[in-house]
């Protein structure tokens, strides 16, 4: 492989995973470490397409509230709450769609690899949004948000296990997207349910993502994409320096007792 590698974060504006693998492979093949399926179709909106997880979940109900993204043209989605009598500890997210989609995309990945458009070392990249981001978007009550993050995280780890039972580990990379729901709070440094100080919040967020990292089999490559958002192609808040990203990564490394193959960070604009 080339000494200068290219990392693709997730969404690629082509129509199908097959088109992503074929076109990107032909252009960037030798420089790729791993390749996502492009999050094509309805998934290009990153999280809006996940609303059915909550709308169809028997333990949730609509609040009638709406979430309006900062990005113009982005999908407006609903807000949900637990039904009366439901404890957050009893909630299971066994209706997640990620494994099924990934396994369908992996079949195309294998086919394109056989044509030679993708070099043998390139791994199939499963990219998953942090529970903190997803729960923040779809759950209205902040106390319920905090309580539901571990349950959703366990559901994601189950999805990783399903994919890892089908995709050869030597061909798989799992990337966790740690987005502005984390870093906007760290930048603003205002007390939240995740901690009264920036240091406390960093510990809380690192522990939550450490659990996700430890849910990836040790012989599957583990990646973290640290993100400040891309609404209308702008960060939700600009990092003054990379210090908070580095602090989070160092804390994360103490929580993840295995190799982290890649950490991707944004940089300050100036």
Outline where the language-model segments fall.
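Alpha-helix-loop-beta-strand connector modules within alpha/beta enzyme cores
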Residues: 203-217
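Aromatic-lined carbohydrate-recognition surfaces of secreted/lumenal glycan-active proteins
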Residues: 172-178, 220-234, 262-268
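Alpha/beta catalytic barrel-like cores
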Residues: 1-172, 176, 183-201, 214, ...
């Amino acid at each position: 492989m080339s000494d200068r590698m290219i990392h693709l974060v997730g969404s690629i504006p082509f129509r199908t995973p097959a088109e992503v693998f074929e076109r990107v492979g032909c252009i960037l093949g030798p420089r790729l470490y791993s390749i996502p399926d492009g999050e094509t179709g309805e998934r290009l909106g990153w999280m809006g397409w996940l609303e059915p997880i909550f709308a169809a979940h028997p333990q949730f109900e609509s609040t009638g509230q709406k979430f309006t993204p900062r990005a113009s043209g982005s999908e407006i989605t609903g807000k949900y709450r637990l039904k009366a009598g439901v404890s957050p500890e009893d909630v299971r997210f066994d209706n997640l769609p990620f494994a099924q989609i990934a396994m369908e995309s992996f079949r195309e990945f294998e086919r394109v690899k056989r044509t030679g458009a993708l070099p043998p070392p390139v791994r199939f990249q499963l990219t998953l949004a942090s529970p903190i981001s997803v729960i923040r978007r779809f759950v209205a009550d902040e106390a319920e948000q905090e309580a539901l993050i571990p349950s959703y995280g366990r559901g994601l780890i189950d999805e990783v296990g399903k994919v890892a039972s089908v995709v050869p580990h030597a061909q798989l990379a799992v990337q966790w997207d740690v987005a502005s729901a984390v870093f906007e709070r760290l930048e603003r440094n205002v007390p939240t349910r995740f901690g009264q100080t920036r240091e406390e919040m960093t510990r809380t967020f690192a522990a939550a993502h450490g659990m996700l990292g430890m849910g990836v089999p040790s012989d599957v490559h583990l990646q973290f994409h640290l993100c400040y958002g891309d609404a209308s192609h702008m960060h939700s808040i600009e990092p003054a320096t990379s210090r908070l990203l580095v602090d989070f990564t160092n804390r994360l490394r103490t929580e993840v007792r295995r190799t982290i193959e890649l950490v991707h960070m944004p940089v300050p604009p100036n």
